From Swiss-Prot:
The lineage of its organism: Bacteria, Bacillati, Bacillota, Bacilli, Bacillales. SMART domains: HhH1 (SM00278). The gene is ruvA. GO terms for biological process: DNA recombination; DNA repair. This is Holliday junction branch migration complex subunit RuvA. Belongs to the RuvA family. One of its GO terms (cellular component) is Holliday junction helicase complex.
Length: 205
């Protein structure tokens, strides 16, 4: 229905952003809302309009490739929008594709809501079909090697990051296991989320 929406970010929350376009605020659910910043500068968000009998929602992504992976994940039995967002929010796109190609169920079950059955279904449905979502232009927006110019964060940023992790489906016990590492840092909300997801996916759960 919509290819993309352009506008400025009026609100950023744990689950979604509000993009103002010509005076209309679009609620757009994204993998990691905190990669966006409130600003009067116009941006473009690639969108996917999800419609079911009990829900109608707009999902947004920074690239077409990210959106394409989202739609492919939705095609897997057992994965809904929330699960697909959690996988994308990890920022480990290359690792996800590699795990599918290598039939690595142990890596895939680390994501919220993905059990062994769903992991096997992901491999069955997507193996050999993801080359078009990881071209050279598809950069890892969540790389630990990024260099940030923003000022360091505070406990407010950490609180926001924890809320975002809960919104993605991570349990309190999982969050609490990585919290000591996060408390050692002074980061922005986006950086806290990336750090936490990196720890969660590398076995510290």
């Amino acid at each position: 229905m919509f290819e993309y929406v352009t506008g400025y970010v009026e609100y950023v929350g744990p689950e979604y952003i509000v993009l103002d376009h010509n005076g209309i605020g679009y609620q757009i659910f994204t993998p990691n809302p905190y990669v966006f910043q409130r600003s009067k500068q116009e941006i473009r968000v690639y969108t996917y309009h999800y419609v079911r009998e009990d829900i109608m929602a707009l999902y947004g992504f920074k690239t077409r490739e990210e959106r394409l992976l989202f739609t492919k994940l939705l095609g897997v039995s057992g994965i809904g929008p929330k699960g697909a967002l959690a996988i994308l929010a990890s920022g480990q796109t290359g690792q996800v594709v590699q795990a599918i190609e290598n039939e690595d169920e142990r890596f895939l079950v680390k994501f919220p809501g993905v059990g062994k059955k769903t992991a096997r279904q992901m491999i069955l449905d997507l193996k050999g079909k993801l080359a078009d979502v990881v071209p050279d232009v598809f950069v890892d927006l969540f790389s630990d090697e990024e260099r940030f110019d923003e000022k360091k964060g505070s406990s407010t940023e950490l609180d926001e990051a924890l809320e975002a992790l809960r919104a993605l489906g991570y349990a309190e016990r999982e969050i609490n296991r990585v919290l000591p590492e996060l408390l050692k840092e002074s980061l922005t909300t986006d950086q806290y989320i990336k750090k936490a997801l990196s720890l969660l996916l590398n076995g510290k759960r």
